[in-house]
Amino acid sequence: MKLSNKAFVSSILALCMVLSLVITTYATTRASAHLDSYRASLTPKSSSRIAITVDVDGTGLMDDIGATKIYVYKSTDNEHFYLLRTFDSKDYPAMMKHNVYYYYDTPIIFQGVSGYYYYAHVDVYAAKDGGSSTRSYTTSSVQASNNPSTTQIAE
């Protein structure tokens, strides 16, 4: 019977260790005092256009929330990328919203070149009562195509 008790206690300790990892993982998903979560993605569209979607969740009602800058990179081989263009929220006001809990939009659609690869580095932002938080997110690369139904995310 003692073996069963040892096995039971060992199982409980193992479960506690696994749960502590889950709690640690959850704690790291909260980005900052103002950013609850954030992500961005690129989507190939028709005629080699690329859409940039940004999703930013605030920790409450934010004075300002969205993306401050979006850096777009281009490659012919999906290995060697160079900076193609920078989008700034000062020039593209659709990249930022005011007095909302979250930001979810596709503020930028740019013209790509069929066969070329693109990824974006997005600086997300949230501000409330004079305090603010900024974090960065890098998307997966996608390939521009004249026929996006055959385009897949490049890994």
Can you describe what each PLM-predicted range is?
Residues M1-I12:
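Bacterial N-terminal signal peptides that target proteins for export
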Residues S11-S20:
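Bacterial N-terminal signal peptides
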Residues L19-H34:
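Sec-dependent signal peptide cleavage junction
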Residues L35-K74:
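Short, surface-exposed binding/anchoring microloops in extracellular/periplasmic proteins
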Residues K69, F81-H98, T138:
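Solvent-exposed serine/threonine-rich low-complexity stretches and specific carbohydrate-binding patches
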Residues D91-H121, A127-K128:
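Short, solvent-exposed, Trp/other aromatic-anchored flexible loops in extracytoplasmic proteins
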Residues K128-E155:
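Short beta-strand elements
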